[in-house]
UniProtKB/Swiss-Prot annotation:
Pathway where it operates: Secondary metabolite biosynthesis
Organism: Penicillium roqueforti (strain FM164)
Protein name in UniProt: Short-chain dehydrogenase anuB
Signal peptide (from-to): none
GO BP annotations listed: phosphatidic acid biosynthetic process; secondary metabolite biosynthetic process; triglyceride catabolic process
InterPro entries in alphabetical order: NAD(P)-bd_dom_sf, Sc_DH/Rdtase_CS, SDR_fam
Protein purpose: Highly reducing polyketide synthase; part of the gene cluster that mediates the biosynthesis of annullatin D, an alkylated aromatic polyketide with a fused dihydrobenzofuran lactone ring system that exhibits potent agonistic activities toward the cannabinoid receptors.
Residue sites binding NADP(+) per the record: 57, 78, 106, 166, 170, 199, 201
Alphabetical list of Gene3D superfamilies matching this protein: NAD(P)-binding Rossmann-like Domain
Active site annotation, chain numbering: 166 (proton acceptor), 166 (proton donor), 170 (lowers pka of active site tyr)
Gene: anuB
Length: 283
């Protein structure tokens, strides 16, 4: 579990410690993306390159030299634990004068399996990170966001084959974000859903050895399944993806639904102008 927090002052003296601050927090929750080459790492670098002071959190066993060597601060925290995030909030609040202008929820674990072959315990674990993690972050950090009249950015995803449960976590995040947007508007906080196309990260690494059950009805598709879980996406890079997200987040008013990443344009077009059953014959 990883979280990045970024802040700068409104008067351009970034990280100056003045009274008028614009602060950004980017949680990268239980994801490889804050490791080198991932989305979280790219976001931290992009905000850093914009002159922000960046705070990140990782699990105790995770290396952080690639962040701290660049002046990016690092905390140890597990964002599935209330106590860890409460402590994190107090630590960040003490450094940012109690306000935060953007919280980016980038849930990141994946469980690849056909819907009818799913191990529900794995799905519960994934929901704990991908859905309940962002909920916990917003619940605990909302006073800082309201004080700053800030933004909440939820990193979502397009649908993909063999990912019914992962798709469900992202659908939950999208719809929760839609309701959250309505509820936070009177409090002066914007909510942005980022709908991500495929990005070249190692999120599938934990699934590389996953196989279909021996008694699965999908055994004839074993080759296609293995190609899916072992592939290395060579499409949008984390750096390209991050740049587009950071540019959108830094706007005075961000788009409610922001599509970015490989194939996001064609998927968005298809969802708007074609029947929902368009993808039924994709396998």
């Amino acid at each position: 579990m990883k979280l990045s927090a970024i802040w700068e002052s409104k008067n351009g003296l970034r990280g100056s410690g003045t009274c008028s601050h614009r602060r950004v927090s980017t949680p990268d929750i239980q994801s490889p993306d804050c490791g080198e080459g991932g989305i979280g790492h790219a976001l931290a670098l992009d905000f850093k390159n914009q002159g922000y002071v960046v705070f990140t959190t990782l699990l105790a066993h995770e290396p952080r030299d690639h962040l701290t060597d660049l002046g990016i601060h690092s905390f140890t925290a597990d964002v599935t634990k209330d106590s860890d995030i409460e402590q994190l909030k107090e630590a960040i609040s003490s450094l940012t004068e109690g306000s935060l202008s953007v919280l980016v929820n980038n849930a990141g674990i994946c469980y690849t399996m056909t819907a009818i072959d799913t191990d529900v315990k794995e799905v519960e674990k994934m929901f704990g990170v991908n859905v309940f993690g962002p909920m916990r972050m917003v619940h605990i950090f909302h006073p800082l966001l309201i004080k700053a009249r800030g933004k909440i950015v939820n990193i979502g995803s397009e649908l993909t084959d063999f990912e019914a449960s992962y798709n469900a976590t992202k659908a939950a995040l999208h719809h929760w974000g839609n309701t959250l947007r309505v509820e936070m508007k009177p409090l002066g906080v914007e909510v942005v859903n980022v709908i991500s196309g495929e990005v070249g990260t190692n999120i599938l690494k934990r699934d590389h050895n996953r196989k279909l059950p021996e008694d699965s009805f999908y055994r004839p598709l074993e080759k296609e399944f293995m190609n899916h879980v072992t592939r290395t996406p060579r499409t949008t890079t984390p750096a390209e993806y991050s740049r587009s997200v950071v540019i959108e987040v830094m706007k005075q008013h961000s788009t409610a639904w922001f599509w970015t990443g490989a194939s996001s344009g064609i998927v968005r077009f298809s969802e708007q102008f074609f029947p929902r059953t368009l993808w039924v014959n994709s396998l």
